[in-house]
Amino acid sequence: MLMPKRVKYRKQQRGRIKGNATRGNTLTYGEYGLQALEPGWITATQIEAARVAMTRYIKRGGKVWIKIFPDKPVTKKPAETRMGSGKGSPEFWVAVVKPGRVLFEIGGVSEDVAKEALRLAMHKLPIKTKFLKREELGGESNES
């Protein structure tokens, strides 16, 4: 499971997710990708479940790139604990995702295989996403 090796501070505030992604919003490595359409937190277990679903479907074919990393700790107090007595201990890690962020990329497979693999990954995630395809440069020209 993904998590930082070490962090400067063990606990963080929740924060707000405002605006669209300005970084990591284009395809970098593969030909196909999965792009977030709404903001949210994606946990390390959800990322791992999506990765396993994709890699099992494409088998030995292509390559999968994970473009997000869970670097935010989420704390939780034990069950049946009274209010007060400080913040709970870190329970799991999340990646903060803004709309437009590319979550996963796939390369080295056909479009049909990539579409189905990313569809399987979509169902493991708590946010709406869309399939992304790399646009080829130098396509049609307007000259007559």
From Swiss-Prot:
InterPro entries: Ribosomal_uL16, Ribosomal_uL16_bact-type, Ribosomal_uL16_CS, Ribosomal_uL16_dom, Ribosomal_uL16_sf. The gene is rplP. Keywords: Ribonucleoprotein, Ribosomal protein, RNA-binding, rRNA-binding, tRNA-binding. Binds 23S rRNA and is also seen to make contacts with the A and possibly P site tRNAs. Belongs to the universal ribosomal protein uL16 family. Part of the 50S ribosomal subunit. GO terms for molecular function: rRNA binding; structural constituent of ribosome; tRNA binding. GO terms for cellular component: cytosolic large ribosomal subunit. SUPFAM superfamilies: Ribosomal protein L16p/L10e. Gene3D superfamilies: Ribosomal protein L10e/L16. PROSITE patterns: RIBOSOMAL_L16_1 (PS00586), RIBOSOMAL_L16_2 (PS00701). GO terms for biological process: translation. Disulfide bonds: none annotated. CDD domains: Ribosomal_L16_L10e (cd01433). This is Large ribosomal subunit protein uL16.
